[in-house]
């Protein structure tokens, strides 16, 4: 449980270390996260900080959301996220305040959560890394077919969870243990080592690593 940031994936590039080693990195743009609500044990049964970021057209904001943002004294954002926190982490936080990239430091290990790219309906080879069947030796139309999916009369059915063709991607994915390479407070940008989930422009959540 820790406060994190909601940002937007800008894409990947690379940087060079002093030794000349190329390091692949992902750039995350983090607009100021505006605090819309602070939840406490007394009022909500748990402790959390609720934030919003970005902008949304007024015509796209419901009346309930307008009231919620107005009560907090912040502009309507494109999404609302919550971070479970401890009592100590609530200190100094107040509704209407902001959280920026200075929350993190260079060298800190973080977990990044995003929505993976949707691949549509895919077969077993692409979806589950199944091996293909023989290219020749009498095989004509079954090169990428799954093969047997069950047993015989007993149990006479395909077990739940069997790896088969189906929808791939477009799901919530968390990549753990990424190192922060750079924190640019002037541009509100985080640079993390390695790849993160989702397409360019997608929303991501950056949290202190749970296994660090």
Curated annotation (Swiss-Prot):
Family membership: Belongs to the universal ribosomal protein uL3 family.
Gene: rplC
Keywords, comma-separated and alphabetical: Methylation, Ribonucleoprotein, Ribosomal protein, RNA-binding, rRNA-binding
Annotated InterPro entries: Ribosomal_uL3, Ribosomal_uL3_bac/org-type, Ribosomal_uL3_CS, Transl_B-barrel_sf
Modified residues (N5-methylglutamine): 153
PTM description: Methylated by PrmB.
A Pfam entry, by short name: Ribosomal_L3
Role this protein plays: One of the primary rRNA binding proteins, it binds directly near the 3'-end of the 23S rRNA, where it nucleates assembly of the 50S subunit.
Stored SUPFAM superfamilies: Translation proteins (SSF50447)
GO molecular function annotation: rRNA binding; structural constituent of ribosome
Biological processes per GO annotation: translation
Coiled coil: none
Annotated protein name in UniProt: Large ribosomal subunit protein uL3
GO cellular component: cytosolic large ribosomal subunit
UniProt subunit comment: Part of the 50S ribosomal subunit. Forms a cluster with proteins L14 and L19.
Ranges where the record places region Disordered: 136-155
């Amino acid at each position: 449980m820790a406060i994190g940031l909601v940002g937007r994936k800008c894409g990947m590039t690379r940087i060079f270390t002093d030794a000349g080693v190329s390091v692949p990195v992902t750039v995350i743009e983090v607009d100021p996260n505006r605090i819309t609500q602070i939840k406490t044990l007394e009022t909500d049964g748990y402790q959390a900080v609720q934030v919003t970021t970005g902008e949304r057209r007024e015509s796209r904001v419901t009346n309930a959301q307008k009231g919620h943002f107005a009560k907090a004294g912040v502009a309507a954002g494109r999404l609302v996220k919550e971070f479970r926190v401890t009592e100590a982490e609530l200190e100094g936080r107040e509704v209407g305040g902001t959280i920026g990239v200075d929350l993190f430091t260079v060298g800190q290990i973080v977990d990044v959560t995003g929505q993976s790219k949707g691949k549509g309906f895919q077969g077993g080879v692409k979806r589950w890394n199944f091996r293909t069947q023989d290219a020749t030796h009498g095989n004509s139309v079954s090169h990428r077919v799954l093969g047997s999916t069950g047993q015989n009369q007993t149990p006479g059915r395909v077990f739940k969870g069997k790896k088969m063709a189906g929808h791939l991607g477009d799901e919530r994915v968390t990549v753990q243990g990424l190192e922060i390479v750079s924190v640019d407070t002037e541009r509100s940008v985080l640079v993390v080592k390695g790849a993160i989930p989702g397409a360019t422009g997608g929303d991501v959540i950056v949290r202190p690593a749970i296994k660090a």
